[in-house]
């Protein structure tokens, strides 16, 4: 019997770990429609395990993500642990059984990418990975910060300068709220 298996290893905690509430660095996964983010120090104290039907897992830092996407429609066990090295892995719960002169193929996708919205969205779309955009942490106010990011990015592409993009974004926000501000006086 054979089991599908994948593992990511990180030797040590990054030296420039910010440990700042705005940006998550550490273990990240989206398993059965649940986003799970675990810090390095939490995993050093206690390992994390979850059985899931679908999803992805990885280790991310400020600018990069390394992720595994297990075979679809198969139950797998995800584990984040620390034994002299940080490990994020999965193993299928059901074995692959082969008879003589038979073969089987399973695809495990590995993605090592920059945390750029266009790159991550490209992988999510081309490889049909649900909620892969969550590797980029927009914070708990993502419903505000993500559209603001796209607006500033649009102005940057239009104007070629982030300073001008921020000024243009500020003008648009001020214009949107002008009637409300004018009404209060």
Map each language-model feature to its residues.
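Generic amphipathic alpha-helical segments used as scaffolds and interaction surfaces in large
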Residues: 95, 138-142, 182
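Aromatic side chains
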Residues: 63-64, 162, 178
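Interfacial loop/helix-cap signal at membrane boundaries in integral membrane proteins
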Residues: 111-162
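Soluble non-transmembrane domains of integral membrane proteins
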Residues: 1-132
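Alpha-helical membrane-inserting segments
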Residues: 152-155, 172, 176
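Membrane-interface amphipathic helices and adjacent TM-edge segments
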Residues: 101, 173-185
